[in-house]
């Protein structure tokens, strides 16, 4: 009953904002009839992106989160809708102070007074999934306490079940649905949002990222206090910084904006290629700038619920793809897509090369500083999808992160030339990958595994030799079978030739006899003779009959 009432509310909001107009035009007849009542509602004087954004906000935090996810999929969602969904606000009414305190005490097994020297009952922030308060530990360290909103898991499960039903219907009943894979999008959302409900997972991500950038001038990650962290409660160091979007404050302290923008790019490539562990939710709300050293500014990152990593093969192919693309070597881009397995092996390299050239050439006619690096990557993947490229979740995360970093960098410093930072980094990374030191590191890394398998080598060699011997014994039989097959093929060809000769002979006989054959038939009863039929026709008929008898 609750699910039915929720569905009614969703339909009412969809009708109010006429979201039926966002659906594909080629809907089945039943669906078209079902949506007819929507046309009774007036047309809102809003763009389609605004209508979708407001509908998400009216439907609550789960749909807000889903809209935010859609804003990270410009490969599937039109650009004007992506732009509007980026403005979705994830601010919701805080849950009760008493409830917050009860959850903390229940999870930590102690009263707030026993764990904290002071505790601010007013929330610092309240979002759809969690709420944050500030506190001070007994030893004087300032912390923030993040608590999962009570009962949110049931709300999420209910709304996702409804979204999945709609997605399956759209995918099964529309051509656009089959192309856009809405079920896959909702499943991706379900994985993402349920990961966000596990604060120990987020804490582990934060610890890893902090270790990767420990003592780095580029990025600071606050410390997690594991002794006070549980699945639904996270306690970590409180940071003080300037929101990265507060340009007035950054300029007031004379921050080197060019360096700040370039360091953002450097952080991205360091995470993706050197650490192979990247913060995949680097939107402006999760990034701050330290007050110290404005001439060499340092970023501060929070909220590590979503992270990504690539396989070593994907790292390698991505680096080579980016370098080839900016050299305008479209042939190599196409070859790398096939070689990496991103597109099926049956795809013609020449066709993919032509498609990539068509998309990229207009972009590269601009000055480098005006080129959107993320947009190039997006166009590349969008083109590859036309050639059956499977959706790679980690590459989608990376693309989304790059869009955020580049957009932020251009906001800080409009003349940012991302390629000037990326090119030497990628060249250096590829060179180091095959450096003797790197190869030695790989050898040491896999040596224990190889040593463990070494005792099996004699058996593997023996089995291999045994198989070769079996192949040797099989060879004469294969040769014999080949000869038999060839003989059968030759016999079949001879039979076919005879059939053709037979047909031609009879056809020739009939053709030669035709002028007098009719006369012979007319006098059949009286003469029982075909004396008027030309002799050549008898000869051809005899040849045909002989060939037919021989083939039997």
Curated annotation (Swiss-Prot):
It is a multi-pass membrane protein. The chain crosses the membrane at residues 22-42, 501-521, 530-550. GO terms for biological process: regulation of ubiquinone biosynthetic process; ubiquinone biosynthetic process. It is found in: Cell inner membrane. Keywords: ATP-binding, Cell inner membrane, Cell membrane, Kinase, Membrane, Nucleotide-binding, Transferase, Transmembrane, Transmembrane helix, Ubiquinone biosynthesis. One of its GO terms (cellular component) is plasma membrane. Its EC number is 2.7.-.-. Pathway: Cofactor biosynthesis; ubiquinone biosynthesis [regulation]. The active site is at 281 (proton acceptor). InterPro entries: ABC1_dom, Kinase-like_dom_sf, UbiB, UbiB_bact, UbiB_kinase. Pfam families: ABC1. The keyword Oxidoreductase does not apply. GO terms for molecular function: ATP binding; protein kinase activity. Residues 118-498 form the Protein kinase domain. ATP binds at residues 124-132, 146. Is probably a protein kinase regulator of UbiI activity which is involved in aerobic coenzyme Q (ubiquinone) biosynthesis. Belongs to the ABC1 family. UbiB subfamily. HAMAP family: UbiB. This is Probable protein kinase UbiB.
